[in-house]
């Protein structure tokens, strides 16, 4: 609730072009902070789904770890070559979805469902609506809400989504549902 209210205020006052990140060269890397590594892809889904321009600090797309208290060398690793993995693939899909979505780039923000382990929020522009859905639990979750339409397409996977009977989110999952017109 505070995030929605605070974000809404900043969003209206400052515009839609602020930079967002989950870690950088001055803080402990997010992969070192999270106690459950299944949450790592989800935090990036949140970053790419929220208003703003997501910035991925180099190495973080591979799940690089590093702690601020261990000094700069821990945070600013050098790499001989890319360490492409499933997280890299996931972030690439999120970036592609964001790149091609008017709502994710310029749309407003509205919270739809919020629990301790799940959130669904709407990004709406003049021509597009996208629901960003995240389940951070180790259990499946079925969300019941009025989507305002019957079907959508997941911008991450390309799969169709039917809102009839509730929307099931598998454990540790995220979706960007582009709503039908």
Annotate each language-model stretch with its function:
Residues 13-14, 103:
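Proline-centered turn/helix-capping motifs that create local helix->coil transitions or kinks
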Residues 1-11:
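Single conserved hydrophobic/aromatic residue that forms the stacking wall/gate
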Residues 5, 35-41, 51-56, 60-181:
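Carbohydrate-interacting/catalytic domains
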Residues 44:
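Conserved glycine-rich, hydrophobic/aromatic-active-site segments
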Residues 14-35:
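Active-site clefts of carbohydrate-active enzymes
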């Amino acid at each position: 609730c505070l995030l929605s209210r605070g974000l809404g205020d900043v969003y209206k006052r400052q515009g839609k072009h602020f930079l967002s990140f989950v870690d950088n060269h001055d803080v402990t890397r997010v992969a070192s902070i999270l106690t459950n590594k299944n949450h790592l892809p989800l935090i990036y889904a949140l970053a790419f789904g929220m208003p703003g321009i997501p910035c991925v600090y180099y190495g973080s797309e591979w799940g690089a770890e590093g702690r601020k208290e261990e000094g700069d060398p821990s945070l600013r690793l050098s790499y001989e070559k890319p360490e492409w993995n499933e997280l890299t693939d996931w972030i690439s899909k999120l970036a592609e979805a964001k790149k091609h979505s008017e709502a994710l780039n310029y749309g407003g923000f509205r919270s739809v469902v919020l629990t301790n382990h799940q959130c669904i929020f709407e990004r709406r522009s003049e021509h597009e609506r996208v629901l960003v859905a995240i389940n951070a639990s180790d259990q499946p979750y079925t969300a019941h809400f009025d989507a305002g339409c019957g079907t959508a397409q997941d911008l991450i996977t390309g799969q169709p989504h039917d809102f009839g009977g509730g929307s099931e989110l598998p454990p540790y999952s995220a979706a960007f549902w582009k709503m039908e017109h």
